[in-house]
Every structure is written in structure tokens, then in C-alpha cells.
């Protein structure tokens, strides 16, 4: 799959995988990973997007999430990675 297809699928609640991005279910629900770092997840009817800055590519992935979420009228919230989903991002 292309990166944009994985991200669009994530926003629509589907799993998918490309070389750098994956959307997969874990114990807390559907999450989006960029290079194995959780950058977004579904919770309470909203997509929670990381506030952490990683690489230009990961920022591009996050911007795509915002773009697709706005098209679908899905609420966006943010999360601070050191405090949320700690076991999923290796901290």
C-alpha cells in the first residue's frame, strides 16, 4: 500500500501497512505508527495526534492524518507521548 492509502485507511478505521507507516490494532485500539513510533490513535471518537516532533517524514505523516481527518469531519486531539501509550512507543 502507499503511505497515503494507509493513513486514509487509519482515519477510516482500517488497518494497513507500507514501508514506513502502519495502522494496526493493539490492546488500546487502532493506532498509527511511523517507523514503529506511535504518532496517532483513536480514542473516544477522536484521533489523538502526537505533539512530539520527530523527523520531517513523520511530520508529513501527521499532516496527512490532519488532512484526511478534516475531510471526514473527525475531531482531532493531541497527546504527549511520554505520558500516553508508553508501552507502545518503547519508553
Regions found by a protein language model. Give the residues of each.
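Terminal leader/tail segments of proteins
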Residues: 1-91
